Amino acid sequence: MKLAYFSVTGQTRRFVSKTNLPNVEISPDDDIEMNEPFLLITPSYAEESPTVSKSIDVMDPVFDFMAYNDNYKHCLGIIGTGNRNFAGIYIFTAKELSAKYQIPLLYDFEFNGTPADVAAVEKLATQLDKGAKVTFKNPL
């Protein structure tokens, strides 16, 4: 199972580099077409007000990637990464994409993840490769 990921500060890139999974990095400069099943790993950068929360512009490449040639149709699940100290906007971008495209949110981790997070994502990818149904593994 391929991982498609976006990294702003390098934390998501560091996480993905610890896995033994094929991957592609989403770039604001390239149009990437996915013709195979993949998992999306995305950080969250959002703003929160009393009436609305939304992802900020730095996350536009992820939204553009998912829309490009209907890449979202090949996405089997979304994994969110962030910082729990941000409370209501923790993994917000992953939740927003999950709702927009009706793609399951399968896992979340903080920063560049732990060895247990790496193992869990590799296990999810293996299960999905075998056609298994998986559900969200971490409490929000």
From Swiss-Prot:
GO biological process, one term: protein modification process
Molecular function GO terms recorded: FMN binding
Coiled coil feature spans: none
Signal peptide: none
InterPro entries per record: Flavoprotein-like_sf, RNR_Ib_NrdI_bac, RNR_NrdI
Protein's job: Probably involved in ribonucleotide reductase function.
NCBIfam families: nrdI (TIGR00333)
Family assignment from sequence similarity: Belongs to the NrdI family.
UniProt protein name: Protein NrdI
Lineage: Bacteria, Bacillati, Bacillota, Bacilli, Lactobacillales
